[in-house]
Amino acid sequence: MLTYKNILIAVDGSHEAEWAFNKAVDVAKRNDAKLTIVNIIDSRTYSSYEVYDAQFTEKSRSFSEELLKGYQEVATRAGVTNVETRLEFGSPKAIIPKKLASELGVDLIMCGTSGLNAVERFIVGSVSEAIVRHAPCDVLVVRTEEIPEDFQPEVATPEFRKQYS
């Protein structure tokens, strides 16, 4: 029987990512696997600022650290016994499949589909698409078009996101 022992889940604070996170917790529990929860602060977002804004960077870092802490608590409470978090800066399209997958020795990467529309996906491509194309391991992309209407995030709640907007 195929089992996964080292799972990476990419989260960004969206409903889609939290939906995928919940599924990653289930897969990690069923396989008694290590779960690494990753958030990438996309450094490309800084390019729109003419002057590097330290306050923006600190707010992004605080958001990511609290997000990862919340997800780690949820995974541990759900019964995942080996949970780690990683915060990185750069392009998620490169860091997740090309750097972290090998560096952490993961055998499964899980992620949600992006919130991009068809035009945005055509122009910039999606993170999940880049992961599928470049990852050296299995990838499970959680389809998020059918998130139940009553789905309520436990970590990336509207109140949580509002603190950092």
Swiss-Prot record:
Any one cellular-component term (Gene Ontology): cytoplasm
UniProt keyword GTP-binding present: no
Family as reported in the entry's similarity comment: Belongs to the universal stress protein A family.
Taxonomic lineage of the native organism: Bacteria, Bacillati, Bacillota, Bacilli, Bacillales
Compartments reported by the entry: Cytoplasm
Top-level taxon of the source organism: Bacteria
Protein name as catalogued: Putative universal stress protein SH1215
Keyword Cell membrane appears in the UniProt entry: no
Gene source species: Staphylococcus haemolyticus (strain JCSC1435)
Chief location of this protein within or outside the cell: cytoplasm
Keywords, alphabetical: Cytoplasm
